[in-house]
């Protein structure tokens, strides 16, 4: 847990959604959330990092509570909060949410689940989300695909794709694909801290186990993220819309879900 805390406390999220694939992730996540959330909701953004989604949702007219484990991330969120998107930001833990029963319209778990390698902890996080949700309240949970690193290593994304020839990297992705456990090698200090990578089916099963009604799973970046020269195409409006149309059409196809680095599962209490 210290590795995870230090990773985020040292600013891992600062700028991440404003560069590279983070831009696609941010755009698509907002697009998906917009289908369910407009304004006037009480939203608990649990594990929401530096508040990128919290700020956006607050600007839409929601009462947003950012509850984040890393102290420096909370302080960054407070220091960079704009007047027109005010939200509550405080330290907290997804396993023990400091909020009353049935007090939120929406709970976002778009960060904590990556780092709960113990299944019991993941079920506890889902149970806490259900506890604080009002009747028929919405939960959106994010997962990282256990095939993401493997797909990245084999893809045309980036300039060099010789990772599978590195035994250290290869052993890392073998662990991810077979057990879901991501153990960051010391040779790759900028990789995400120790995590649990999963599948949408596994996450849906865990969510249903704590009596949520699972509505659907949606791929975030989908199959477009390894497009050659993605950054250039994304800057071109016509190309960007074509890419987005592709991912929208395929976003719920089970056969495509594992190709997406991130996915969201939508559920109701």
Regions found by a protein language model. Give the residues of each.
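Conserved class I S-adenosyl-L-methionine
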Residues: 1-39, 44, 52, 56, 138-176
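Class I SAM-dependent methyltransferase SAM/SAH-binding core
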Residues: 44, 52-96
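A short acidic, Gly/Pro-enriched loop at the edge of an enzyme's catalytic core
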Residues: 95-107
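A short SAM/SAH-binding and catalytic strip from SAM-dependent methyltransferases
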Residues: 106-120
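Acceptor-substrate binding/catalytic loop of class I
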Residues: 116, 187-202
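A short glycine-rich, Lys/Arg-flanked "PGG" loop and its adjoining helix->strand segment in the class I
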Residues: 123-135
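C-terminal lobe and adjacent flexible extensions of AdoMet/dcAdoMet transferase-like proteins
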Residues: 206, 210-269
């Amino acid at each position: 847990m210290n590795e995870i805390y230090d990773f985020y406390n040292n600013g891992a999220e600062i700028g991440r959604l404003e560069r590279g694939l983070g831009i696609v992730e941010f755009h698509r996540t907002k697009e998906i959330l917009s289908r369910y959330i407009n304004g006037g909701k009480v939203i608990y953004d649990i594990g929401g990092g530096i508040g990128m989604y919290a700020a956006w949702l607050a600007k839409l007219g929601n009462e947003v509570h950012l509850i984040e484990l890393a102290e420096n991330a909370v302080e960054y969120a407070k220091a960079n909060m704009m007047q027109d998107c005010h939200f509550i930001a405080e330290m907290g833990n997804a396993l023990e949410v400091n909020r009353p029963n049935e007090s939120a319209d929406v709970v976002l778990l778009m960060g904590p689940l990556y780092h709960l390698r113990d299944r019991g902890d993941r079920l506890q996080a889902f149970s806490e989300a259900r506890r604080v949700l009002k009747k028929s309240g919405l939960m959106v949970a994010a997962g990282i695909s256990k095939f993401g690193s493997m797909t990245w290593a084999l893809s045309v994304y980036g300039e060099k794709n010789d990772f599978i020839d590195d035994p250290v990297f290869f052993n890392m992705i073998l662990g991810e694909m077979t057990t879901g456990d991501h153990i960051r090698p010391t040779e790759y200090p900028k990789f995400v801290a120790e995590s649990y990578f999963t599948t949408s089916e596994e996450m849906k099963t865990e969510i249903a186990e704590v009596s949520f009604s699972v509505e659907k799973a949606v791929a975030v970046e989908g199959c477009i993220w390894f497009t050659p020269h993605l950054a250039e195409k994304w800057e071109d409006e016509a190309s960007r819309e074509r890419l987005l149309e592709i991912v929208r059409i395929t976003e719920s196809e089970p056969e495509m879900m594992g190709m997406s680095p991130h996915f969201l599962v939508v559920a109701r209490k």
